[in-house]
């Protein structure tokens, strides 16, 4: 039976909100490891925003850190603007990811966050979350796990760009994306790229032409099937090997 206070919150939000207790990707997000009482406390501080449309921004570089954003659905890209005025993509965030961690140190966002497709996010006031985590060890631990995961991702990206050639970079990108989809309960073998080839090239330090040529090469070798933005992994062992991994896509 659904507790009365949760029903009231649903009525107040128009009956369309998905709360932490019911969210399908909560195991990837802040609620993981929290008990029911802790979940209720967290739920009370979260604002469920209306859908964010493609091209809209969650925050801009230089904005004061007021909230973190947990992605419920869709894809958000983070990027900075170089001194030359060029966009440099620093990450692609999927459902279950938390966006805005990199602003905690200075109190201001060093990057932009923009929706690549219609997305749903939970807005979490940072000061309130920080205060709550001081009272809830499980919440504090989970925040540290999420931040650790982001640091590890940054380290992997540095290694990717410094050690791998163009083929290996793209293979690693597709392989890692498939693993992330699998963690979220989606097919790791068949998926749609929400980012453009230009975005992928920008992120990997490659040209659009190189991305297109490599995708064609991967398809010709039987490793992938490519149809527009849709990718099917035909030979997961070959992809994993080229990406520098030995485990199968599962």
Curated annotation (Swiss-Prot):
Region annotation (Activating region 3D) ranges: 112
Main location: cytoplasm
Spans annotated as Activating region 1C: 181-191
Region ranges (Activating region 3C): 85-87
Cofactor binding, per record: Binds 1 [4Fe-4S] cluster per subunit.
Region span, Activating region 1B: 116-121
Domain of life: Bacteria
Gene Ontology cellular-component annotations: cytosol
Compartment annotation: Cytoplasm
Gene3D superfamilies: Jelly Rolls, Winged helix-like DNA-binding domain superfamily/Winged helix DNA-binding domain
Renumbered residue ranges of the record's region Activating region 2A: 47-50
Cofactor dependence: [4Fe-4S] cluster
Region ranges (Activating region 2B): 123-124
Binding positions ([4Fe-4S] cluster): 20, 23, 29, 122
InterPro entries linked: cNMP-bd_dom, cNMP-bd_dom_sf, Env_Response_Regulators, HTH_CRP, RmlC-like_jellyroll, Tscrpt_reg_HTH_Crp-type_CS, WH-like_DNA-bd_sf, WH_DNA-bd_sf
Pfam families in UniProt: cNMP_binding (PF00027), HTH_Crp_2 (PF13545)
DNA-binding region: 197-216
PANTHER family the UniProt entry points to: CRP FAMILY TRANSCRIPTIONAL REGULATORY PROTEIN, FUMARATE AND NITRATE REDUCTION REGULATORY PROTEIN
Subunit structure and binding partners: Homodimer.
Record function comment: Global transcription factor that controls the expression of over 100 target genes in response to anoxia. It facilitates the adaptation to anaerobic growth conditions by regulating the expression of gene products that are involved in anaerobic energy metabolism. When the terminal electron acceptor, O(2), is no longer available, it represses the synthesis of enzymes involved in aerobic respiration and increases the synthesis of enzymes required for anaerobic respiration.
Protein name: Fumarate and nitrate reduction regulatory protein
Organism of origin: Salmonella typhi
Taxonomic classification: Bacteria, Pseudomonadati, Pseudomonadota, Gammaproteobacteria, Enterobacterales
């Amino acid at each position: 039976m659904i507790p009365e206070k949760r029903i009231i919150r649903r009525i107040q939000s128009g009956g369309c909100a998905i709360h932490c207790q019911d969210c399908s990707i909560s195991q990837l997000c802040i609620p993981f490891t929290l008990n029911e009482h802790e979940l209720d406390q967290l739920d009370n501080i979260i604002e469920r925003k209306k859908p964010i449309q493609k091209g809209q921004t969650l925050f801009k570089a230089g904005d004061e850190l007021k909230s973190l954003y947990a992605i419920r659905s869709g894809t958000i890209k983070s990027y900075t603007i170089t001194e030359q005025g060029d966009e440099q993509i620093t990450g692609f965030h999927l459902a279950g990811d938390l966006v805005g961690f990199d602003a905690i140190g200075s109190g201001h966002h060093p990057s932009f966050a923009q929706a690549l497709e219609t997305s749903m996010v939970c807005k979490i006031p940072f000061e309130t979350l920080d205060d709550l985590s001081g009272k809830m060890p499980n919440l504090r631990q989970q925040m540290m796990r999420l931040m650790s995961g982001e640091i590890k991702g940054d380290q992997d990206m540095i290694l990717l760009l410094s050690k791998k050639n163009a083929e290996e970079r793209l293979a690693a990108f597709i392989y890692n994306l498939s693993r992330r989809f699998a963690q979220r309960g989606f097919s790791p073998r068949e998926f749609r790229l929400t980012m453009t080839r230009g975005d992928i090239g920008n992120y990997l330090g490659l040209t659009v032409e190189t991305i297109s040529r490599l995708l064609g090469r991967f398809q010709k070798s039987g490793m992938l099937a490519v149809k527009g933005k849709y990718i099917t992994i035909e030979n997961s062992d070959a992809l994993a090997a080229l990406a520098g991994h030995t485990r199968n896509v599962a």
